[in-house]
């Protein structure tokens, strides 16, 4: 079985990198990445920059994205603009996009990676908790996509990749809120691909599985989730890595996928087909993880 590419657990750049794609695949492109200060979004920014792209990374904490940007610039030599923005607030989105366009003069790629999630039975889910996840995942994705379309993509074309999830593919216990929010984003992907395709705008979703070294995995499964994976029969029996997700996003964002639009690319080692889907099993998983 092929070994996964090297990765690091925290929000740090890779100590070394071997190109699997042409190093100038995204030469002089500019990518606007929500949630780019940590986790999957951070690694997407790094991999894009290692392939010639400049990036704008946005998040609610300016300090966090500024720290991340310094790491990215030091590791890749490309430009990275950190901006504070809440995807739920359209005026903030408009301001951030204006700042990015002022800095770079263009935005070629949008990665919607901002998200929020937690485990909760539907019966215990508060109105506000459900709304919060939908506001970040679904409304936030629409807000940023809409603003970028009006300010640049409508006249110049572009690429949008929405980071979603496999939760809605079969229904998942304890994940009604996130599953519903991400399913809506996948539907949005298809609608926008149809409506905006004639203006040379490609729109796709990428649905990761369980990915090591992410805050999402730590929140959902405990700090030692990796060691528990062997108890489940994933077709590819390991966690995915942030670098693997970033490589898949790189493909969708690049000219390699020039005729790909309106799809949901699942990158989870096949786990959506076999992951346990009973409350008892998942609660046991949580209990086991908490003791490790």
UniProtKB/Swiss-Prot annotation:
Pfam families in the cross-refs: adh_short_C2
GO cellular-component term (any): peroxisome
Reactions this protein catalyses: a (2E,4Z)-dienoyl-CoA + NADPH + H(+) = a 4,5-saturated-(3E)-enoyl-CoA + NADP(+); a (2E,4E)-dienoyl-CoA + NADPH + H(+) = a 4,5-saturated-(3E)-enoyl-CoA + NADP(+); (2E,4E)-hexadienoyl-CoA + NADPH + H(+) = (3E)-hexenoyl-CoA + NADP(+); (2E,4E)-decadienoyl-CoA + NADPH + H(+) = (3E)-decenoyl-CoA + NADP(+)
Chief site of localization: other
Residues binding NADP(+), per UniProt: 35-40, 60-64, 86, 182, 208-214
Keywords, in A-Z order: Acetylation, Fatty acid metabolism, Lipid metabolism, NADP, Oxidoreductase, Peroxisome, Phosphoprotein
Annotated substrate binding sites: 60, 88, 118, 126-128, 219
Transmembrane regions: none
Modified residues (Phosphoserine): 287
Sequence positions bearing N6-acetyllysine: 64, 151, 291
Motif Microbody targeting signal: positions: 290-292
Modified residues (N-acetylalanine): 2
BP GO terms, sorted: fatty acid catabolic process; unsaturated fatty acid biosynthetic process
Record bears the keyword Chaperone: no
Assembly mode: Monomer, dimer and oligomer.
Identification of the protein by name: Peroxisomal 2,4-dienoyl-CoA reductase [(3E)-enoyl-CoA-producing]
The organism of origin for this protein: Mus musculus
Lineage per the UniProt record: Eukaryota, Metazoa, Chordata, Craniata, Vertebrata
């Amino acid at each position: 079985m092929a070994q996964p590419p090297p990765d690091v657990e925290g929000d740090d750049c890779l100590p070394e990198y071997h190109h699997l794609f042409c190093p100038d695949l995204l030469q002089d492109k500019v990518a606007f990445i929500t949630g780019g200060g940590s986790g999957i979004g951070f690694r997407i920014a790094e991999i894009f920059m290692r392939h010639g792209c400049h990036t704008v990374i946005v998040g609610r904490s300016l300090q966090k994205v500024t720290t991340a940007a310094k790491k990215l610039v030091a590791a890749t030599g490309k430009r990275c603009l950190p901006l504070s923005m809440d995807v739920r607030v359209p005026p903030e989105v408009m301001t951030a996009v204006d700042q990015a366009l002022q800095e770079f003069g263009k935005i070629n790629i949008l990665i919607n990676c901002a998200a929020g999630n937690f485990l909760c039975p539907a019966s215990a889910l508060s109105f506000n908790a459900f709304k919060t996840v939908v506001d970040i995942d679904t409304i936030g994705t629409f807000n940023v996509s809409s603003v970028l379309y009006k300010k640049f993509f409508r006249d110049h074309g572009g690429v949008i990749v929405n980071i979603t999830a496999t939760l809605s593919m079969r229904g998942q216990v304890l994940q009604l809120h996130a599953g519903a929010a991400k399913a809506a984003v996948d539907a949005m992907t298809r609608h926008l691909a149809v409506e905006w395709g004639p203006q040379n705008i490609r729109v796709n979703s990428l649905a990761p599985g369980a990915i090591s070294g992410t805050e999402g995995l730590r929140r959902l499964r405990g700090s030692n989730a990796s060691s528990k994976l062997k108890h489940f029969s994933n077709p590819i029996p390991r966690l995915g890595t942030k670098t693997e997700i970033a490589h898949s996003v790189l493909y969708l964002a690049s000219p390699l996928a020039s005729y790909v639009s309106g799809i949901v690319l699942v990158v989870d080692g096949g786990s959506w087909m076999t992951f346990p889907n009973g409350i008892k099993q998942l609660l046991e998983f949580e209990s086991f993880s908490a003791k490790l």
